[in-house]
Regions:
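Short, acidic Ser/Thr/Gly-rich low-complexity loop/linker segments typical of extracellular
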Residues: 36, 63-82
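Short, ordered, surface-exposed loop/turn motifs in non-cytosolic proteins
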Residues: 40-42, 48-64, 68, 88, ...
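Short Pro-Gly-centered beta-turn/loop motif in secreted/extracellular proteins
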Residues: 51-53, 82-90, 98
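A short, solvent-exposed loop/turn motif at the edges and junctions
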Residues: 62-68, 90-111
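The canonical Cys-X-X-Cys-His
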Residues: 175-186
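Structural signature of eukaryotic scaffold interfaces centered on beta-propeller domains
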Residues: 269-290, 342-362, 393-400, 454-473, ...
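Conserved beta-propeller blade signature
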Residues: 293-297, 364-368, 402-406, 475-479, ...
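Blade-level signature of beta-propeller repeat domains, shared across WD40, Kelch, NHL, RCC1
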Residues: 538-539, 630-687
Length: 687
């Protein structure tokens, strides 16, 4: 045999061996080792042309139950998955993941092994259709820092009152605009529909029209005022660049503990309903209402409460009685420009605007409304109006069973139960800022909007958007909207109010932050946690303040050392320097009793623009995403322990789809809100 012949034989042999390896690899992929499942599970392996697909979602959905039911899990490092504990039904099962397009839906029932074939996205644009809204919103290019202060109508169209780029960004987030009501970056919001482009070849004109469309058209139009109509060009350019093919960066796939998350959704309410918040339990004792109903309030869209039974997989609605028929509507009743979904129909007809529910130690749900409070008792099946209860926006229970409200008022539940006198059980704390620094409240103080007199205290009003009582010292903390905004501490005993602003253009801080919305507390340490819409999750430790907490120098920016800013996940706006994210955060929450499985007092942040809730665990983010349907926007959240002896199955985090425009979600105008539970398994294959 010649050398050339031997080389040919060796080459052919090598190719044959390589072909055998490739063939066996494909055979192994097709005949993957079954995963361990029970009779109520579905399990298998997800592969694509690239091999096993790690960190992608497997969705199981059914409409066979009393309400639509969806359970989602994540594959492990070898592409394996287990969808656990499914109620008996026929399920559509498919794969969704970043870098993929949806696989075909496969019909199956629990107890079956089901290997799934994932589809690699044919183009980057096809893959990007599945990205969260905030990744698309991050393509927006805000005005450059040199555009500020604004120069008004005759200049750049931005009001002179907007002094910095941060103020402009804050106003397109949670400062009474845009992302306070819905996600920005969804397909509905980022693209200009073809018919609108035909009607308005100029994209600025198209955007001017679209912010006047539908039931919220008047509100959107007026909300543009603080940033000026000249700001429309930045949104128009955003849409034009996307239409021209610009794409966002790809989000990371779930890693680590993110792969252990099980997400369960139950459909409730109606396709025209705005569910603002829900509640599962008394957060002070999260075993209250174990396996019981999850209660949601339908704000603005109607005077209803939605109730989910997660055991029977059913939901119902309870109508609230309007006691004063002369009460005006909670939302405008005009449609400036017809909706592409609902036409001229006024789809929201509510008067009471139920806003926020909280459960007490007996499992009763207290609900704030425009005319005070409603009290829902799930066990008795009763709903009653509580005369004298202050009501309003948000509420929180202190350990002594006083309810504190965002208005700064309170309601003594124990006194009310003993006397039945609601008016006598309500109260408020008159307060001042201790400007003269003598440690006591000196009334009357100087006017809050007048010049500072260092010898006299300054008038103040307790209250804010969100609030939390401190169980360690009895103080009440509030978040106050604005740029930079603030958090305030009310001591009901001394009647003194302290004001702390996040560091903003402060030479003692390397970073600037602004616009608090939610607020909560570490129950063990008293450290405050605040979601800042500069794109940060911030902790504030009053014990770290080095200077005086009161006195003439304590004007807000006096304790930058008390703040720790954690940049939130996700990209920042294009061309914006510094840390932060284009995501928005309606509220945040601290898990006092390990209901989520990450440990006591784990701080959590609601990613209102990113289809997620997030846990900050040992300084690292765990992002819990709802991949289907796209457009999951939460506002508040809580956690419940149904069975402390049942491990991960006996506990979970709860929230609800709270997109004001439900029809912006994947599924369009037929899509209904959903109650959502997150559970943390020990592994992606735990059953």
């Amino acid at each position: 045999m010649t050398r050339g012949t031997r080389r040919l034989v060796l080459t052919c042999g090598t190719l044959a061996a390589l072909f055998l390896v490739i063939s066996m690899t494909g055979l192994n992929a097709r005949q993957a080792t079954p995963v361990s499942i029970d009779a109520d599970d579905i399990g298998g392996v997800v592969t694509s042309t690239k091999g096993p697909e790690a960190g992608v979602w497997v969705v199981a959905e059914t409409r066979d139950l009393p309400t639509r039911f969806i359970r989602t899990v994540v594959t492990d490092s070898r592409g394996r998955y287990v969808v656990p504990d499914l109620p008996p039904a026929s399920y559509d099962v498919w794969v969704r993941g970043y870098g993929l397009v949806d696989s075909p839906k496969v019909k199956t029932t629990p107890g079956k092994q089901l290997n799934l074939k994932a589809l690699v996205a044919p183009t980057p644009a096809a893959a990007a259709e599945y990205y969260p809204a905030n990744y698309w919103y991050a393509l927006l290019e805000p005005p450059a820092p040199t555009e500020f202060p604004g120069t008004g109508r005759k200049g750049n169209g931005i009001p002179e009152s907007i002094k910095t780029q941060g103020e402009w960004i804050g106003n397109i987030k949670m400062n009474l605009a845009c992302t306070q009501c819905h996600q920005m970056g969804t397909k509905v919001t980022r693209e200009i529909p073809p018919d609108l482009r035909t009607k308005f070849p100029n994209s600025v004109d198209a955007w001017d029209e679209r912010i006047q469309i539908g039931i919220s058209g008047a509100f959107m139009n007026s909300s543009l005022g603080p940033i000026g109509r000249g700001s429309l060009k930045y949104f128009a350019r955003w849409s034009d660049r996307i239409a021209g093919g610009e794409l966002p960066v790809a989000p990371p796939r779930p890693e680590g503990q993110e792969r252990n998350i099980v997400v369960t959704q139950w459909e409730w309410a109606t396709a025209k309903t705005f569910v603002h918040d829900g509640i599962a339990t008394d957060r002070r004792n999260p075993t209250v209402n174990a396996y019981g109903p999850y209660v949601g309030v339908e704000e603005l869209s109607g005077d209803w409460v939605s109730v989910l039974d997660p055991v029977k997989h059913s939901s119902k609605r309870i109508e609230l009685e309007v006691l004063d028929n002369k009460m005006p509507w909670a939302w405008q009743q005009d449609v400036p420009v017809p909706s592409r979904y609902w036409g001229d129909e006024v789809i929201w007809k509510g008067k009471l605007a139920p806003h926020n529910p909280m459960a007490d130690s007996k499992g009763r749900v207290w609900i704030t409304t425009r005319d005070g409070c409603r009290l829902y008792d799930p066990k008795a099946g009763t709903m009653r109006h509580i005369a004298g209860c202050p009501g309003g926006g948000h509420l929180q229970f202190a350990d002594d069973d006083k309810i504190w409200f965002g208005s700064g008022k309170y309601f003594d539940v124990k006194k009310w139960e003993a006397t039945g006198d609601g008016k006598a059980s309500a109260g408020a704390v008159e307060t001042v800022v201790d400007t003269n620094g003598n440690g006591k409240a000196d009334f009357p103080g100087t006017p809050a909007d007048g010049p500072v007199d260092p010898t006299r205290d300054r008038q103040a009003k307790a209250g804010g958007y969100a609030l939390i009582p401190n169980p360690l010292d009895g103080s009440i903390w509030y978040s106050v909207l604005g740029i930079p905004g603030s958090i305030t501490r009310l001591d009901p005993k001394t009647q003194l109010l302290e004001v702390y602003e996040p560091p903003f253009n402060n030479p003692k801080s390397k970073q600037s932050a602004y616009l608090p919305h939610g607020i909560d507390i570490d129950r063990a340490t008293g450290v405050i946690w605040v979601g800042l819409n500069s794109g940060h999750y911030a902790s504030f430790d009053r014990r770290k303040c080095q200077g005086p907490l009161n006195g003439p120098t304590a004007t807000g920016q006096h304790c930058p050392e008390g703040w720790t800013l954690h940049p939130a996940p996700g990209p920042n706006f294009k061309t914006v320097e510094g840390t932060g994210s284009a995501d928005s955060y309606y509220l945040n929450w601290v898990d006092w009793h390990n209901t989520g499985g990450f440990g006591n007092n784990t701080p959590m942040l609601v990613g209102s623009g990113s289809d997620s809730i997030m846990a900050l665990v040992a300084g690292k983010w765990v992002v819990m995403r709802v991949p289907y349907p796209r457009g999951f926007m939460a506002r508040g959240m809580d956690g419940r322990i149904d069975d402390p002896k049942a491990g991960w199955k006996g506990r979970g985090l709860w929230t609800t789809h709270s997109e004001q425009a439900t029809w912006h979600q994947e599924g369009g105008p037929t899509e209904r809100p959903k109650a959502v539970q997150f559970q943390l398994r020990p592994t992606p294959l735990a059953k």
